[in-house]
Amino acid sequence: MARAVGIDLGTTNSVVSVLEGGEPTVITNAEGARTTPSVVAFAKNGEVLVGEVAKRQAVTNVDRTIRSVKRHMGTDWKIDLDGKSFNPQQMSAFILQKLKRDAESYLGEKVTDAVITVPAYFNDSERQATKEAGEIAGLNVLRIVNEPTAAALAYGLDKDDQTILVFDLGGGTFDVSLLEIGDGVVEVKATNGDNHLGGDDWDQRVVDYLVKQFANGHGVDLSKDKMALQRLREAAEKAKIELSSSTETTINLPYITASAEGPLHLDEKLTRSQFQQLTADLLDRCKTPFHNVIKDAGIQLSEIDHVVLVGGSTRMPAVAELVKELTGGQEANKGVNPDEVVAIGASLQAGVLKGEVKDVLLLDVTPLSLGIETKGGIMTKLIERNTTIPTKRSEIFTTAEDNQPSVQIQVYQGEREIAAYNKKLGMFELTGLPPAPRGVPQIEVAFDIDANGIMHVAAKDLGTGKEQKMTVTGGSSLPKDEVNRMREEAEKYAEEDHARREAAESRNQGEQLVYQTEKFLKDNEDKVPADVKTEVETAVGELKEKLKGEDSAEIRTATEKVRGRLPRIWARRCTANAQAEGAAPGADAPGDAQAKADDDVVDAEIVDDEKDTKGGAA
């Protein structure tokens, strides 16, 4: 049975985990790291770079590097590159493809099934967009799971009955959830959050501060310089991380820009106190969702048994202090890695769905109320927020006008009394109603939410039996054929990247063989007969000519031709050695060295030459 993985698709970093012998293991990526930056870049040669390699070249390729795409999920955001238009689902699919490849490399088998996590406060369209991203990446998405729920699953599977508060502050989103755990049941009691609050916002405050300081000191506005701004973003992130363990840091960026007088350098000190002042209002925004969760769950602070911090941003001392203050002095649990716990929980849920993990029941909730617009623009709720899913609710509605031939069902998600102030998820029409006075027809509207938090709506005229259904997937939803087209496109990119890697390997092997053969001939000049030497040198010359071009097939053919000549010079050299009494053992033949080199070849992510020559931030 193919194994399923758990994926934490984060705003700034992503993680993939798998169950091995019933225990979750975080998979190390091709670069040797346990987290992969959620960054996608298009190199000058059209190659798609993902992760650390994409992040490293961002300074010299600002316009073609995309980060924090998770903040655009469920929207109509698009970016045009090389004559093609890309949406958030496609960008996320590139990241998921990279995680899928890393998992396949680690496991030595194909990976198709996955559980993907989303912020608890993601609405219907954001969840659907995440599911579509997985499908485009070639994954069968078994379940969309809320991040705090996954974290609680990872933390509390073996714990006794207890109440857990999960405080999840990531790179771009913030959630607070209250869960009850006991007897293998993980039940979410309440959840709240802010989908546009995270570590990126703390970074941006430092960037704004540095731009202001530099303008005051040099009269130059760095916000107008894209490359300088990218260097500032990277420096701001590093400064934020350093200030979690130090009380002061220095941000030093030489040659950040130039003026008429010459190059200008940025050199600023930033203390933890200054940093906390710059970001005090962001910290305050964490308070309201916390209080809402406690209120919705109807519990006292003293009833919370454990506090679990999730997301890299919770490493900031001010955040940890805030959580301690909000929970009445309770210390957060230090037994989980905030970067990895969500992916671990996702892999456990994947194990539950595949039958590898027994006796575990995950009861999640819908984060926002769902309803329809009724007369006067009022939001009539059918499903209240924090309702356990999957669930189904229905209500009877009627017409507002005499002889009304149809009714329009407009579906909304949110907490406001006026429908227009909430998030509109979709609409459809039930037509063919027989003429009748207003208030007479009986129309049953049913909401059905599946375990992924994705909703299906049906409207039925009880008089005629006519019915209309739809899956509410929000404005971002893609038609099935569009998802299939994007999946084929993503596979095409993967094939192109594979071809590029193969071409690079062929070139590397050819160049290595030229070097080793020429060295071997030089070192054994007196032991190789002139006719054999001439034959080999001719083949090497042909290979060198082919290496000047770009035809990989010709390079491979020329390489094999040289390899085919090697046994002859090796045999002649061995004969010469045997005839020379007391001769010391010689060096490896180039064929042997090449074979050894081939054993050591690993897949490398190729980056464009321009990046290498220009270099990154100093």
From Swiss-Prot:
**Gene that this polypeptide is encoded by:** dnaK
Its recorded name reads Chaperone protein DnaK
Compositionally skewed regions (Basic and acidic residues) per UniProt: 489-505
User: Sorted alphabetically, which NCBIfam families does this protein's record hold?
Assistant: PRK00290.1, prok_dnaK
What switches on expression, per the entry, is described as: By stress conditions e.g. heat shock.
Give the similarity note: Belongs to the heat shock protein 70 family.
> Where are the residues of the annotated region Disordered?
489-512, 577-618
Entry keywords, A to Z? ATP-binding, Chaperone, Nucleotide-binding, Phosphoprotein, Stress response
Which GO terms fall under molecular function for this chain's record?
ATP binding; ATP-dependent protein folding chaperone; unfolded protein binding
- Function summary: Acts as a chaperone.
Residue numbers bearing the Phosphothreonine modification? 173
Give start-end positions of Low complexity composition bias. 577-594
Looking up HAMAP family in the UniProt record yields:
DnaK
Report the superkingdom from the record: Bacteria
SUPFAM superfamilies xref list:
Actin-like ATPase domain, Heat shock protein 70kD (HSP70), C-terminal subdomain, Heat shock protein 70kD (HSP70), peptide-binding domain
Task: Give the compositionally biased regions (Acidic residues).
Answer: 600-610
